[in-house]
Each structure stands twice: as structure tokens, then as C-alpha cells.
A protein has these predicted regions:
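SAM-dependent methyltransferases
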Residues: 77-79, 96, 106-120
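A short acidic, often aromatic-flanked loop/helix-cap motif at beta-alpha or helix-coil junctions
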Residues: 30-32, 97-100
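Helix N-cap/beta->alpha junction signal
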Residues: 25, 102-103
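Residues at or immediately preceding the N-termini of alpha-helices
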Residues: 61, 104-107
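A short, conserved beta-strand element in the Rossmann-like catalytic core
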Residues: 1-2, 98
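Conserved active-site beta-strand element of glycosyltransferases/polysaccharide synthases
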Residues: 89-93, 99-102
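Conserved core of the sugar-phosphate nucleotidyltransferase
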Residues: 2-90
Length: 120
């Protein structure tokens, strides 16, 4: 319910335009740093080319079926499986409202966003 319609439109349009695998992405806003084994901060990772991958992800049916049939490796999402096949994954604009809901804080944020949308 949090994904704005334009994100779905972007994903579907990219698949229809010939991309076999598509993910919505948003720029990272946090500073990203490496951390060494002794918990010391290492280098700051330049974030200008980094993006957070969101859902919904889009695929042609044959590519997604092949990925699920052939990939038996640890991955975090379907796009990771498709990449293991050597297939490029295309990025489209996502939206900050389409965040992943996995932690208790995410539930609070999602509820607040839903309430905000309901009352505007």
C-alpha cells in the first residue's frame, strides 16, 4: 500500500520496453562507511553512484522462471538471482515512500505515512 502508482508504472514500462529485469531505486542519503574488524571506521564510500533497491521488481516471465529454477545461491532478492544468470538488471526511479517494512520502526513509519495520506 505504500508504493506510489508511478513506481509500478515505471517498472512495467521498462519491462514492456525490452528490459528483462527491472528494479526501482532511490539515492542513498546516509553516509556509508566501511568498518574494520576492530570496529574502527574505514573509508567513506562515495554515494553518488549508490542506490537502494526497492520493490516491486519486474521481470519477463521466462527470466524469472529460469532464475528460480537455476540459481541456488544466497541472494537477497529476485534481481540478485537474475544477476547470477548474467542478465543485466535495469534501474528506474523509485520513491522514498516505497520503503521496506521489516523492523518494528518501519511499521511505525508505515502507519504514520498511511495516516498522513488518509488525512490530507
Amino acid at each position: 500500500p505504500l508504493v506510489p502508482p508511478e513506481v509500478i508504472t515505471n517498472v512495467v514500462a521498462a519491462v514492456r520496453n525490452g528490459h528483462a529485469a527491472v528494479v526501482p531505486v532511490v539515492p542513498l542519503v546516509d553516509t556509508i562507511r566501511t568498518v574494520t574488524g576492530d570496529a574502527s571506521l574505514g573509508a567513506t564510500v562515495p554515494r553518488d553512484s549508490l542506490r537502494a533497491v526497492q520493490t516491486p521488481q519486474g521481470f519477463t516471465r521466462d527470466v524469472l522462471q529460469r532464475a528460480h529454477a537455476e540459481v541456488d545461491a544466497p541472494v537477497t532478492d529476485d534481481a540478485g538471482m537474475v544477476e547470477r544468470l548474467g542478465i543485466a538488471v535495469h534501474a528506474v526511479d523509485g520513491h522514498e515512500d516505497a520503503f521496506k517494512v521489516t523492523r518494528p520502526l518501519d511499521v511505525v513509519l508505515a502507519e504514520a505515512l498511511i495516516e498522513h495520506r488518509r488525512t490530507r
